């Protein structure tokens, strides 16, 4: 069994102001994505300035935050937030939905693309290889918050999470780290290597949806579902898995469509 590192969820406290690691991980993810997007910018569109890229990152970040929070409210705990709507604003306590954030990003990309002469999938293909940086950083934030841990297990790398998080004090799968490894590291490598060569429009977006859906679906088997939802069917199907099914199907369809439709402008390769 591995010891769980005792990390205060509050990274910095200045009087009543508290800066949480969870929030800092979002900044790390957004900053890392912006840096890598800057590296690809000239190949994506030589006419784009760093200022336009910053605008894109800003609006996509708003899509992640607003969509992620509202997605969690709608998909995972609607009744609690209806009873106490002010909880919606307590983002530092966790409660963000990737699938809600994904919808928020798509809406932001659709709006931004129309204003800047880019199609939806041109922007999504450009952005997709950077998204795993934010996903990985977010999973580290979950780990520091001691939330979203896995089922009890006797594997050698099991961890006992703090009593405030897990009163049962059982050795558990560190499922946040599994997701960091798959959704962060592995997905980044797949997309970065795949996009190094010119690809037809929609192919990179399809690869993102397909592999994120597969990785998340797999980890859900060892991750404890949200207490207010539990398993939806068969004592193993979770809300996360249900939401991943359309991503997997949609990803496969986009990849098929990208390679079978009439030729279109390919996504710019990665440097």
Curated annotation (Swiss-Prot):
EC identifiers of the protein: 2.5.1.145
Places the protein is found: Cell inner membrane
Broad EC category: transferase
A Pfam family of this chain: LGT
InterPro entries: Lgt
Keyword field: Cell inner membrane, Cell membrane, Membrane, Transferase, Transmembrane, Transmembrane helix
PROSITE patterns: LGT
GO molecular function: phosphatidylglycerol-prolipoprotein diacylglyceryl transferase activity
GO BP annotation list: lipoprotein biosynthetic process
Membrane spanning residue stretches: 10-30, 56-76, 92-112, 120-140, 174-194, 202-222, 237-257
Listed GO CC annotations: plasma membrane
Superkingdom: Bacteria
Pathway noted in the entry: Protein modification; lipoprotein biosynthesis (diacylglyceryl transfer)
Membrane topology: Multi-pass membrane protein
Primary location group: membrane
Chain sites annotated for binding a 1,2-diacyl-sn-glycero-3-phospho-(1'-sn-glycerol): 139
Its job: Catalyzes the transfer of the diacylglyceryl group from phosphatidylglycerol to the sulfhydryl group of the N-terminal cysteine of a prolipoprotein, the first step in the formation of mature lipoproteins.
Family to which the UniProt record says this protein belongs: Belongs to the Lgt family.
Protein name: Phosphatidylglycerol--prolipoprotein diacylglyceryl transferase
Species name: Pseudomonas fluorescens (strain Pf0-1)
Gene name tied to this protein: lgt
């Amino acid at each position: 069994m591995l010891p769980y590192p005792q990390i205060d969820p509050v990274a910095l406290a200045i009087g009543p102001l508290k800066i949480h690691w969870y929030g800092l991980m979002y900044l790390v993810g957004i900053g890392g994505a912006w840096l890598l997007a800057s590296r690809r910018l000239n190949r994506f569109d030589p006419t784009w300035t760093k200022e336009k890229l910053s605008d894109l990152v800003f609006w996509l970040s708003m899509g992640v935050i607003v969509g992620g929070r509202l997605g969690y409210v709608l998909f995972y705990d609607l009744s609690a937030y209806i009873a106490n709507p002010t909880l919606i604003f307590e983002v530092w306590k966790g409660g963000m939905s990737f699938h809600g954030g994904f919808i928020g990003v798509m809406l932001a990309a659709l709006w931004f693309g129309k204003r800047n002469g880019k199609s939806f999938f041109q922007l999504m293909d450009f952005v997709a290889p950077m998204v795993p940086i934010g996903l990985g950083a977010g999973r580290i934030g979950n780990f520091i918050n001691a939330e979203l841990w896995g089922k009890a297990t006797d594997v050698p790398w099991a961890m006992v999470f703090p009593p405030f998080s897990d009163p049962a004090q059982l050795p558990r799968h560190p499922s946040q780290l599994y997701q960091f490894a798959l959704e962060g590291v592995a997905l980044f490598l797949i997309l970065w290597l795949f996009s190094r060569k010119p690809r037809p429009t929609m192919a990179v977006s399809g690869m993102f949806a397909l592999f994120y859906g597969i990785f998340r679906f797999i980890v859900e088997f060892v991750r404890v579902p949200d207490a207010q939802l539990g398993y939806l069917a068969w004592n193993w199907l979770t809300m996360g898995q249900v939401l991943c099914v359309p991503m997997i199907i949609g990803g496969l369809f986009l990849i098929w469509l990208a390679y079978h439709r009439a030729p279109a402008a390919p996504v710019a390769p990665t440097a």
